[in-house]
Amino acid sequence: MKKLALLLAALGVMSATTFAAESALRITNVGQEVEIENESGGSNIGESVYFGTSVGLAYKDWTFGVIGAKRWNVDTDDVDSVTGRVVLDAWKHYDNYKLGFRFRSEKDYDRYYARGAWNHGMFWGSADLWYEAKSGKDVKGNDKNDTWRGEIFPIGVQYNGIKLGWFVDAEIVSGSVADGYREQNFEHQLRLYAPLYKGEKLTLTTQIRHTLTVDDKFNKENVSKESRYEDFGRTRVYLESDYKVNEALNVYLKYGYEFREKEYVANGKSDENKNYFGDLIFGWNYKF
């Protein structure tokens, strides 16, 4: 009887310890990332050079993320600080879908996101919807316009690691817009994700984004100095590599190149000044 009592007590301690461990907020991963975006006609190195540190956490069926970052405009002759960035994420996970919230703050705006994603058999989808509250003045000295934005995959299909999704990028500007500036934009794309190689440590994948249609509206198009993407006017291709250093640590490198055709809003003539875009991303991630 005494042995049984001791065994039950030991099981009780183990169960309590396990429950406490599962119930505690824990760190799941940490990482750092550099992203360099460069457009033809811009800075020699990158108009947007981003460096960020991220921490992932989990609590029961919730996951959280915290990102602190800095962004610069980098030329061979000069480095200009552009903005800092703070991002807070929270996700509630269910059987085959999840719902979340994101707050993102930079020097010139704050964003408030509602997020969702689902995955069921061969089908999947996701949506990031946000309100962007801007600060500062526009070109005419008026307060900058807030915007409603959305990046949505209404539906996608997947099979053996290959994913194909219909993507919608939507923007609606709140309030009156200065002459020549965009009031709204809806861009439809097809996006393909596919594995290329998988070894013991090295994995190679690709991502292809192809624009189908662009439907936008400008206030007084005839005076606009902006340019827009033509229908079927851009294709971006990423080559992505991930190397598993050990069970916990991986490093990655990605490069994207965008082929584009743009036209001036006012007269429909081709914009040859911005026909190139490159995106270089590299970083590391450590899982606990």
Summary of predicted features, one role per range:
Residues 20-77:
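Short glycine/proline- and aromatic-enriched beta-strand/turn motifs that initiate or cap beta-hairpins
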Residues 33-39, 67-73, 102-106, 128-136, ...:
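Outer-membrane beta-barrel pore domains and translocons
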Residues 39-41, 137-144, 174-181, 220-228, ...:
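Extracellular loop and loop/strand-boundary signature of outer-membrane beta-barrel proteins
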Residues 51-59, 86-92, 114-120, 150-159, ...:
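Residues on the lipid-exposed face of transmembrane beta-strands in outer-membrane beta-barrel proteins
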Residues 61-66, 93-99, 121-129, 158-168, ...:
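Repeated loop/turn-to-beta-strand initiation elements of outer-membrane beta-barrel proteins
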Residues 69-183:
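Outer-membrane pore/translocation modules
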Residues 99, 191-271:
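Outer membrane beta-barrel transmembrane domains
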Residues 272-288:
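Outer-membrane beta-barrel "beta-signal"
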